[in-house]
């Protein structure tokens, strides 16, 4: 279920304050955040935001196709360990 249009998109207040205080167009500026539930807004395009995935901050470069999605969608929390190809015990 999506958020009501009358409420507007959710973005954490501390993240919005960081975005307003920093020049986001500079490539060396990385904004760290723990707010995975914040929605990507059009004024964030071109910024690099390091989103916490539970272990480390994953840098995410915001492009115009990402507008409307959540920051957590681009920072995976789980790593896939591939299945063992030659497991002789499993063949029995």
From Swiss-Prot:
GO CC annotations, alphabetized: chloroplast; mitochondrial small ribosomal subunit
Give the GO molecular function terms: rRNA binding; structural constituent of ribosome
Q: Which residues form the signal peptide?
A: none
Fetch the Pfam families from UniProt.
Answer: Ribosomal_S19 (PF00203)
Q: Which GO terms describe its biological process?
A: ribosomal small subunit assembly; translation
Please state the protein's primary subcellular location.
plastid
Superkingdom of this protein's organism: Eukaryota
> Where does this polypeptide localize?
Plastid, Chloroplast
Matches recorded under SUPFAM superfamilies: Ribosomal protein S19
Keyword Ribosomal protein in the entry? The reply is yes
Check the record and name the PROSITE patterns matching this protein. Answer: RIBOSOMAL_S19
- Say if the entry is tagged with keyword Nucleotidyltransferase: no
Keywords, sorted A to Z: Chloroplast, Plastid, Ribonucleoprotein, Ribosomal protein, RNA-binding, rRNA-binding
Write out the function statement from the record.
Protein S19 forms a complex with S13 that binds strongly to the 16S ribosomal RNA.
Q: Which family does it belong to?
A: Belongs to the universal ribosomal protein uS19 family.
**What protein name does the entry list?**
Small ribosomal subunit protein uS19c
Which species is listed as the source? Guillardia theta
> Which gene does this sequence derive from?
rps19
């Amino acid at each position: 279920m999506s958020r009501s249009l009358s409420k507007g998109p959710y973005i954490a207040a501390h993240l919005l304050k960081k975005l307003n205080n920093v020049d986001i167009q500079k490539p060396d500026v990385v904004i760290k955040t723990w707010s995975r539930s914040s929605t990507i807004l059009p004024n964030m395009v071109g910024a690099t935001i390091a989103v916490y995935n539970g272990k480390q901050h994953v840098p995410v470069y915001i492009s115009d196709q990402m507008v409307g999605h959540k920051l957590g969608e681009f920072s995976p929390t789980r790593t896939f360990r591939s299945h063992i190809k030659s497991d002789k015990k499993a063949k029995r």
